[in-house]
Amino acid sequence: MVVVAAVVVAAVAVVVVEEDRIKTKYINDIVWKKISGLEFDNQNAELTFSKRLARENRWPQWYALDVIEEYRKFLYLLQRAKHPVTPSIEVDQVWHLHLTYSEFYWEDFAKGMPVKPHHGPTRGGSDEDNKFIDWYAKTLESYEQIFGNKPPVHIWPSKDERFRANQSWAWIDVSKHFIIDRNAGYVYILFIIFLMILVATIF
């Protein structure tokens, strides 16, 4: 039992040392220091970057802040992974918004970076789909290798979920339209039909 316990302790120690080594490697990188030092929220602004991100995506504030932190890691992967990288949909929303703050993006972040951080959307077609699926899978692998832990699934879903078929994204003015979950919507429709039949029966 003593030997087994000693082996377990040694294994845990090795894992901790390895995690510390990985963390030390990227934390001491000048590229990471610049990225981690980016101030996304101007506290003098009534509508800050994170509040705008939360509002445009209908996210709670805490989630918007979490995604921004994952976006920092994506920016680092973009610079240090030895292959093209692809963000999750959530992280991509931060990237899109960051690009609209053009001076902040190109002067405060991109200037002097080893890799020019251009955003290249898909040109469509199965070849492009397969390319981005491959890049995303490699991005998840590099995330774990560089940061020493798996990416959080609530921000970085699996490649199958990230690229599931029949996705349809659109900007909607919620002051003019209701948003109803499709699965729940069927229940609402059946309920309304039931009420209509009930009313017709009574009257």
Task: Kindly give the residue locations of the regions a language model identified.
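Acidic, Ser/Thr/Pro-rich intrinsically disordered cytosolic tails and loops
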Residues: 1-6, 11-203
